[in-house]
Amino acid sequence: MQTFRRALLVAALLAIAAPGARGQSAPLNPANAKPFLGVWVIEMTEPAVFKGTHTIRVWDNGGTVAASLQTNPNFPAIEATGIHRDGNMLVLTLSHNAKPHPMMENGMPIWAVVSAVVDGNTMKVAQMLERSQTIKRGAGNRQN
């Protein structure tokens, strides 16, 4: 299982780096992201040491999909720098160029990849952080 998780993390990080090498893909159309649109409050439950509430917002930004991740209610949301749909999964990337600031860990900017799957009224999330072997997991419901 650990090997699978590492392979998933490597694949996700390659997906982040690959668009720069082969050119950007077309922006995601809101009609193709309809199940994901909204504000989702996610209770991160695994691993237990990282329990907490995250908010994922996905919206129609003038004909393209935009998204943000807020990991703490006391800090501003961070806008996703990459948004891709792969089958029933929405993949968000937050790079060192994220606005208003990149995600930080131990004072250093880090990349983050968030995969989300909507199952009925529930969004299931896995969050992978650069330089970490831990995959954070959680689930939550749409708030609007």
For the regions a language model picked out, list residue spans one by one.
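Bacterial N-terminal signal peptides that target proteins for export
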Residues: 1-9
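Sec/Tat signal peptide C-region and signal peptidase I cleavage site
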Residues: 19-23
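A conserved amphipathic terminal alpha-helix motif
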Residues: 121-122, 144
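Central antiparallel beta-sheet cores of small beta-barrel/beta-sandwich binding domains
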Residues: 24-118, 126, 133-134
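Bacterial N-terminal signal peptides
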Residues: 9-17
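Short, solvent-exposed mixed-charge patches
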Residues: 24, 141-144
